[in-house]
Design a protein with these regions (language model features):
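C-terminal alpha-helical cap of glycosyltransferases
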Residues: 361-378
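Acidic donor-binding loop of glycosyltransferase active sites
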Residues: 106-107, 270-285, 292-293
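Glycosyltransferases and closely related glycan-assembly transferases
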Residues: 45-50, 94-109, 117-131, 144, ...
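A short, well-ordered alpha-helix in the C-terminal region of glycosyltransferases
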Residues: 341, 348-362
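Short amphipathic alpha-helix
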Residues: 8-20
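Donor-nucleotide binding loops and adjacent catalytic segments primarily
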Residues: 17-22, 31-32, 36-48, 60, ...
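Active-site-proximal region of nucleotide-activated glycan assembly enzymes
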Residues: 26, 50, 124-189, 197
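Phosphate/nucleotide-donor binding subsite
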Residues: 49-104
Length: 378
């Protein structure tokens, strides 16, 4: 189970595919929060429409990395939301408890996110084996709590970034779709033609994740003419921001395209010569598997600063370029300048992308499925 963003769901689907391949008659169910259910249903149904996608009441404990504890405790609306969500967590626990009693699964697998907390706690109480996966280099609160009782723990980044018990923890990477593999030059050209993009020009793909990224979109709006001097641009803006941007940006052509979201992201990313994105763990590993030159713009305001810590892992390895968001907003031309530098030094950029590719774990879904099967109760 998982929820809150596509980064929690798409890896689960990769694992579901592997489990179904090994055990065609296995009974699978996907649980998530109600807010994310429509997207989760679409993602799961693309693999197998017979897998039920069910919702769990859940609440999140809001914490903001850029605020002090005192500021958070004296923010009335924040305190009110956290208190209200405490009751939602209790409700979700009771709901999960009875759902698990009725279903009695052999294993509960959680991918992270606040919706997993009540389910994981209920599984613990019912002594159902629990396997958790942590994608981010900074473990989330839910996984830090559930790790105390988890039968097995899998991580998306190398083990030195975690304090989990070593005897129960394994670095498997992040399960991703098998379509995320390096594109040859001919495959890249074919992908550009598939997207009706000029194949003779470099392609810059900008994506803020499934929900979009307002501040990255703002930079693209303000610098698009400058970016188009460097190459064609495709902006995946997020469904909630698409209409506003469509009204102020050029019509789609072979040098610029705007989308709310795309379903075949591997094809679009494969067509790219450089990708600009947030530092979500799943997106990072998809790009690593493609060996794409990548510019990360982490959101420093998210819980625990986990995107900042994700970015550091790959920046320290010389595998990506990283831009500070505040500095970028102060000097929006910095993005185009960084892209130009990558294009101006093709050998250096190719070496960076190759180092990035070493983080890919093509067997992550298989390894994750093996851990789940090993944990099941007899």
């Amino acid at each position: 189970m998982g929820g809150g963003s596509g980064g929690h769901v798409t890896p689960v689907v990769a694992v579901l595919k592997e489990l179904r391949a090994r055990h065609p008659r296995v009974e699978l169910r996907f649980w998530c929060d109600a807010k994310f259910a429509p997207q989760a249903r679409a993602t799961v149904a693309a693999f197998d429409a017979t897998i039920p996608v069910q919702t769990i009441v859940a609440g999140k404990f809001r914490r903001y990395y850029h605020l002090t504890i005192f500021q958070q405790l004296t923010w009335p609306s924040l305190v009110a939301k956290n208190v209200g969500d405490l009751f939602r967590i209790v409700t979700g626990f009771v709901q999960s408890f009875f759902k698990l009693i009725i279903w009695r699964p052999d294993v509960v697998f959680t991918k992270g996110g606040y919706v997993c907390l009540p389910v994981g706690l209920a599984a613990r109480l019912l002594r159902i084996p629990l396997v958790i996966h942590d994608s981010d280099a900074h473990p989330g609160l839910t996984n830090r709590v559930l790790a105390k009782w988890a039968t097995a723990i899998a991580t998306g980044a190398p083990l030195e970034y975690y304090s989990y018990p070593k005897d129960r923890t394994r670095y498997v990477g992040i399960p991703i779709a098998t379509e995320f593999q390096p594109f040859s030059k001919s495959q890249q050209i074919a992908a550009k033609k598939e997207w009706a993009i000029a194949s003779e020009r470099p392609l810059i793909v900008v994506t803020g994740g499934g929900l979009g990224a307002t501040r990255i979109n703002e930079v693209i709006v303000d610098t698009l003419p400058r970016l188009q001097q460097s190459g064609s641009v495709v902006l995946v803006a997020g469904a909630g921001q698409y209409d506003e941007l469509r009204a102020v940006m050029p019509a789609n052509s072979d040098t610029f395209q705007l989308y709310p979201f795309v379903t075949n992201m591997h094809s679009l990313l494969g067509a790219a010569d450089v990708v600009v994105t947030r530092a979500g763990a799943t997106t990072i590993l998809e790009l690593a598997a493609l060996e794409k030159p990548t510019i990360l713009i982490p959101n420093g305001k998210l819980t625990g600063g986990h995107q900042l810590k994700n970015a550091v892992v790959y920046q320290e390895a010389g595998a990506v370029a990283v831009l500070d968001e505040d500095a970028l907003l102060a000097n929006k031309q910095q993005l185009a300048e960084t892209i130009d530098q990558l294009f101006a030094e093709p050998k250096v950029t190719a070496a960076m992308a190759h180092r990035f590719g070493k983080f890919a774990k093509p067997d992550a879904a298989k390894d994750m499925a093996t851990m789940i099967i090993a944990a099941r109760r007899s």
